[in-house]
From Swiss-Prot:
<dbReference type="GO" id="GO:0042802">
    <property type="term" value="F:identical protein binding"/>
</dbReference>
<feature type="topological domain" description="Extracellular">
    <location>
        <begin position="293"/>
        <end position="304"/>
    </location>
</feature>
<feature type="binding site" description="in chain B">
    <location>
        <position position="122"/>
    </location>
    <ligand>
        <name>histamine</name>
    </ligand>
</feature>
<feature type="topological domain" description="Extracellular">
    <location>
        <begin position="471"/>
        <end position="473"/>
    </location>
</feature>
<keyword id="KW-0770">Synapse</keyword>
<comment type="similarity">
    <text>Belongs to the ligand-gated ion channel (TC 1.A.9) family. Gamma-aminobutyric acid receptor (TC 1.A.9.5) subfamily. GABRB3 sub-subfamily.</text>
</comment>
<feature type="glycosylation site" description="N-linked (GlcNAc...) asparagine">
    <location>
        <position position="105"/>
    </location>
</feature>
<dbReference type="GO" id="GO:0030659">
    <property type="term" value="C:cytoplasmic vesicle membrane"/>
</dbReference>
<feature type="glycosylation site" description="N-linked (GlcNAc...) asparagine">
    <location>
        <position position="33"/>
    </location>
</feature>
<dbReference type="GO" id="GO:0009986">
    <property type="term" value="C:cell surface"/>
</dbReference>
<dbReference type="Pfam" id="PF02931">
    <property type="entry name" value="Neur_chan_LBD"/>
</dbReference>
<feature type="binding site" description="in chain B">
    <location>
        <position position="227"/>
    </location>
    <ligand>
        <name>histamine</name>
    </ligand>
</feature>
<dbReference type="GO" id="GO:0021549">
    <property type="term" value="P:cerebellum development"/>
</dbReference>
<dbReference type="InterPro" id="IPR006201">
    <property type="entry name" value="Neur_channel"/>
</dbReference>
<feature type="binding site" description="in chain A">
    <location>
        <position position="122"/>
    </location>
    <ligand>
        <name>4-aminobutanoate</name>
    </ligand>
</feature>
<keyword id="KW-0869">Chloride channel</keyword>
<dbReference type="GO" id="GO:0034707">
    <property type="term" value="C:chloride channel complex"/>
</dbReference>
């Protein structure tokens, strides 16, 4: 009962107020009363001195700021900056602009801003900024009856963002926007984020091709220079790079090219043209990928994560080419060279021995035999020739073979020849084995290729495991 009566009383007393507000609004919008608004604006601007800040000589002016981010257009690693388009709004109170008789806010033409005092705000890490001017200059001045001024701008700024690219492209970057007063110190002006943590909006709408915004932070502090202490506001973005683009454009091609270089291990080692062409092609392709990547990044003095990976892939590709060079050397180089050297050495020794022996005949009539003659005589001996009366084979400690002319008794000579025959055969076999040329085992090139088929994939897999565990975590 009492609630119903109270509601009626509230309606009775509030009705005149609503009627007055509506009448006031209608009177302002009425063309006949536009002269009153014009007189009010003229009165506010008459005698207004833009050279003096509000409450000059008194407490500092408190300037609140809001930012509505329209877009982040580009993040450049080459120039170490990013481009941001935003609606930048500043609020402060200027008692000289307070008015009465008009219960509405006055949104004035943007050119009025040139006749009013505005904060000397600038972006500390700005490289290039501009206020949009299509179709007119994108700025706004709105006056409130209590003298509060809203000054809004649509700005595109390119701000510096110093990046640490050691973990590129598995990195996270912090890019900031530093807002500061250029001339007024903290004795004259103070900055604050209007609305606290909600002072910046539009972050959730931003979509970047290579980054994801993990978080943003707002900071308010004072910085001290030689000319005094100045207020500073900071908007910081934490950007995490999306790895998908780099997997498709860099990592996967590098992995496939590295695997392609291992195909040469399955190609026959005497197919030089195929293996060399494959090795050189993969090396040049890796070089091209490295060159293209360096063109898209700044010239920095430290090694990046992607440099480590591409260098590792390049090493594997280059080692695959060197593996065939080693196989080629074993098959076509070292083996024949060793065989040729041994043959030349043996021939030279044989010629020297033949030449020296041909000129030597001792006093007893011993005749020097060559290895070939010894071999022929042994064939005769093994062939059943048992008559050793005319000749006998003997060896001295120097390994020189002699045929001694002698005429032993028939029975005694046959007995000596038969008894010494096994000993002579054994000794001749041992001496003739020393004359054989040791031909290298050329089948080891197949073993090199077989081991390469196992070692290269295993070490490359281990390299990938260590790389991704280190940089991802």
């Amino acid at each position: 009962m009492w609630g119903l009566a109270g509601g009626r009383l509230f309606g009775i007393f509030s009705a005149p107020v609503l009627v007055a507000v509506v009448c006031c609004a209608q009177s302002v919008n009425d063309p006949g009363n536009m002269s009153f608004v014009k007189e009010t604006v003229d009165k506010l601007l008459k005698g207004y001195d833009i050279r003096l800040r509000p409450d000059f000589g008194g407490p500092p002016v408190c300037v609140g700021m809001n930012i509505d981010i329209a877009s982040i257009d580009m993040v450049s690693e080459v120039n170490m900056d990013y481009t941001l388009t935003m609606y930048f709004q500043q609020y402060w109170r200027d008692k000289r602009l307070a008015y009465s008789g008009i219960p509405l806010n006055l949104t004035l033409d943007n050119r009025v801003a040139d006749q009013l005092w505005v904060p000397d705000t600038y972006f500390l890490n700005d490289k290039k900024s501009f206020v949009h001017g299509v179709t007119v200059k994108n700025r706004m001045i709105r006056l409130h009856p209590d003298g509060t001024v809203l000054y809004g701008l649509r700005i595109t700024t390119t701000a510096a963002c110093m990046m640490d690219l050691r973990r590129y492209p598995l990195d996270e970057q912090n890019c900031t926007l530093e807002i500061e007063s250029y001339g007024y110190t903290t004795d004259d002006i103070e900055f604050y984020w209007r609305g606290g943590d909600k002072a910046v909006t539009g972050v959730e709408r931003i979509e970047l091709p290579q980054f994801s915004i993990v978080e943003h932070r707002l900071v308010s502090r004072n910085v001290v220079f030689a000319t005094g202490a100045y207020p500073r506001l900071s908007l910081s973005f934490r950007l995490k790079r999306n790895i998908g683009y780099f997997i498709l454009q860099t990592y996967m091609p590098s992995i496939l090219i590295t695997i392609l270089s291992w195909v040469s291990f399955w190609i026959n080692y005497d197919a030089s043209a195929a293996r060399v062409a494959l090795g050189i092609t993969t090396v040049l392709t890796m070089t091209t990928i490295n060159t293209h990547l360096r063109e898209t990044l700044p010239k920095i003095p430290y090694v990046k994560a992607i440099d480590m990976y591409l260098m590792g892939c390049f090493v594997f590709v280059f080692l695959a080419l060197l593996e065939y060079a080693f196989v080629n050397y074993i098959f076509f180089g070292r083996g024949p060279q060793r065989q040729k050297k041994l043959a030349e050495k043996t021939a030279k020794a044989k010629n020297d021995r033949s030449k020296s022996e041909s000129n030597r005949v001792d006093a007893h009539g011993n005749i020097l035999l060559t290895s070939l003659e010894v071999h022929n005589e042994m064939n005769e001996v093994s062939g059943g020739i048992g008559d050793t009366r005319n000749s006998a084979i003997s060896f001295d400690n120097s390994g020189i073979q002699y045929r001694k002319q002698s005429m032993p008794r028939e029975g005694h000579g046959r007995f000596l020849g038969d008894r010494s025959l096994p000993h002579k055969k054994t000794h001749l076999r041992r001496r003739s084995s020393q004359l054989k040329i040791k031909i290298p085992d050329l089948t080891d090139v197949n073993a090199i290729d077989r081991w390469s088929r196992i070692v290269f994939p295993f070490t490359f897999s281990l390299f990938n495991l260590v790389y991704w565990l280190y940089y991802v975590n």
